[in-house]
Amino acid sequence: MKNLIRLFLILFVAGIAIGTHTSCSEDSDCSIAGRAMINCTLYRMPAPSETILQNDTLHSLTVTALGTDSIIINNQKKVHTLSLPLRFTSDSTVFIFYYAYREDPTLCDTVYIKQDNTPYFESMDCGYSMKQSILGLGHSEVELDSIYISNKQANTDGTENLKLFYRNRD
């Protein structure tokens, strides 16, 4: 009889532990880490005699979004790739790239991205999310020479979306 009661208690406690574990294990990732971004890689504008693209590195970069007080990248050093969020509430996003923010705030380029925002239902926990794709873009040409769209869909896996070509600064 004691063994039967002991077995019942063990099964009862094990059932509660398993039930608690499985009910809490399906947490959805609604964090900012799950948000799709535009991933950019920096390249040096090739000379006419060059046939191979070479990666570029900016000494310093600060990126802000026009119309907000947010700093997306704050004085990051040795930049060769960056991930930028697109706006959910508008069909365009404007980024300002400051190359020497503290020394010369006028040394900057503006990148204008026109995007398509398509809402979709993700889950009961997360609600709606947004699929975003680039429709077109424009930019100033202070330091930036050109931009090539390599993938129009914003993504979470780090796939390159934009190739940013900078003039040779040597």
Model-derived segments and their meaning:
Residues 1-34:
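Bacterial Sec-dependent N-terminal signal peptides
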Residues 24-32, 37, 41, 78-170:
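Extracytoplasmic cysteine-anchoring/structural motifs
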Residues 41-54:
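Structural motif
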Residues 51-70:
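Extended low-complexity, serine/threonine- and proline-enriched intrinsically disordered segments
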Residues 72-78:
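Short beta-strand segments within Ig-like beta-sandwich modules, predominantly Fibronectin type-III
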